[in-house]
Amino acid sequence: MLMAGQRGAWTMGDVVEKSLEGPLAPSTDEPSQKTGDLVEILNGEKVKFDDAGLSLILQNGLETLRMENALTDVILCVDIQEFSCHRVVLAAASNYFRAMFCNDLKEKYEKRIIIKGVDAETMHTLLDYTYTSKALITKQNVQRVLEAANLFQFLRMVDACASFLTEALNPENCVGILRLADTHSLDSLKKQVQSYIIQNFVQILNSEEFLDLPVDTLHHILKSDDLYVTEEAQVFETVMSWVRHKPSERLCLLPYVLENVRLPLLDPWYFVETVEADPLIRQCPEVFPLLQEARMYHLSGNEIISERTKPRMHEFQSEVFMIIGGCTKDERFVAEVTCLDPLRRSRLEVAKLPLTEHELESENKKWVEFACVTLKNEVYISGGKETQHDVWKYNSSINKWIQIEYLNIGRWRHKMVVLGGKVYVIGGFDGLQRINNVETYDPFHNCWSEAAPLLVHVSSFAATSHKKKLYVIGGGPNGKLATDKTQCYDPSTNKWSLKAAMPVEAKCINAVSFRDRIYVVGGAMRALYAYSPLEDSWCLVTQLSHERASCGIAPCNNRLYITGGRDEKNEVIATVLCWDPEAQKLTEECVLPRGVSHHGSVTIRKSYTHIRRIVPGAVSV
């Protein structure tokens, strides 16, 4: 059996009792509600009686009838056991039995029906669920219950078993669960298991079951940019081990799986001595074009660009947070973009902001009060006082800014947020008034469309996304006032709603989603606040020693970094603060070469093959 007897830590209990309809109220002879709660008065002459508790009474009554073998009209014979049931109940709960009893099949008229493909214990579990909405799922029975529920089309039970398996994933059982999901066409479970394998690739490589992965599944896993490996040689060796496991069957599949190994990124000596010298590689002429691409890349540097020359997210890279543009103490515009690497305690220089390196100073653009965000490791910037309609994206692999489609409505003092694979540009100021317009960018089609407008027109607010929703916090409804409102957008309904207000009214603030909370800092607050979307409540995280109006905040390496800003004397700040959620401690991380405010701050993974390290003395730590 898949789950029984396997090793590995469980992320949930070994036994879970699932109630798919919510908690059951206790059975009682007394009315569960006052009659007045169930009555809607209509015109004073008649009432509409809506008894929400009747469904529970019916369910309890049907279970009692089954236990008493009363009014049952069919017997299900499983192995040597017999189960007396009601056809109507089975048909209502299962599409399988609905088709059996509602169509002109022989079982429609038979008193006793032999059921195959399931054991008696599992059928007992499914029937208990049918009559009570409860089922006991354990690691010993989950596979059998899932297979039977899928056979008889108890779809909600299938979902419950899939959720149980998702929570129980570990390196020893994930390949088996993946095969189970594939066999029964459980696409959602399959995607989650594949994602788990991608994120835990190194730990799973030693599993014997890994060598039995179907070729298409292996191809999909190796193609992922998120494949967690420390070097590409691990991917190559995995492919060759998989082929050698059944060489007569799999040698012909080598070109198909090898195309997802990023051979150009292998060490040149390893490529020559290990890859090109491998006997199976030499026996397969179809892979020679892939070898030639790698040779050319090694000879010509980075001029050859393909999917195989793009580093994976976890190879040769470090997670860094960027400080983009901004203003200095004398209100001078900053064109530089700097990456700070907390782990290596160094500063890294990348391409300057676009349109800022013309020979004539008068031709250069000043990026003032723009917005920025990261999508798929590319940084998007938009708007600004002198660049109201401009939108650019920074490609970290080639260290260049690329212009994309203009905004429909120019703006500044706005925000950008990523949600559902799209970029949202929200609110802001158009030079005359605060606007409530929201635009959505589709990267695939390079086009903008309009989403539902904000409930409150604001600029200089904080915004971020969290679990399929977008949050706009605080901001200025005009030039003098600030608001404490929290506006929430649900893309599934294209509607905004108001949530719990922030503890203080604030503008010139920024927010970031981190773990299960949204953190907000800036303005005149002298504090870091956190909002819980699950509980719809706010709390104070920690006090700050100074105001940090128009500062930046970004998550990096499981910590939060607060950069720059302006204090209560309107002086720019050069320090970088670090909030450690584990230690619950705020510390000063480093000092920037110069103070900055109104800048952008985002996190990316940056390859060291595409950046120039600035001398260590440039940063005070």
Curated annotation (Swiss-Prot):
GO cellular component, as recorded: Cul3-RING ubiquitin ligase complex; cytoplasm
Gene Ontology BP term (one): B cell receptor signaling pathway
Every BTB domain range: 72-139
Entry keywords, A to Z: Kelch repeat, Repeat
InterPro entries per record: BACK, BTB-kelch_protein, BTB/POZ_dom, BTB_POZ_KLHL6, Kelch-typ_b-propeller, Kelch_1, SKP1/BTB/POZ_sf
Top-level taxon of origin: Eukaryota
Tissue: Found in germinal center B-cells.
All residue ranges annotated as the BACK domain in the record: 174-276
Kelch repeats: 320-367, 378-421, 422-468, 470-516, 517-558, 560-606
Gene Ontology MF terms: ubiquitin-like ligase-substrate adaptor activity
Function field: Involved in B-lymphocyte antigen receptor signaling and germinal center formation.
UniProt name for this protein: Kelch-like protein 6
Source organism phylogeny: Eukaryota, Metazoa, Chordata, Craniata, Vertebrata
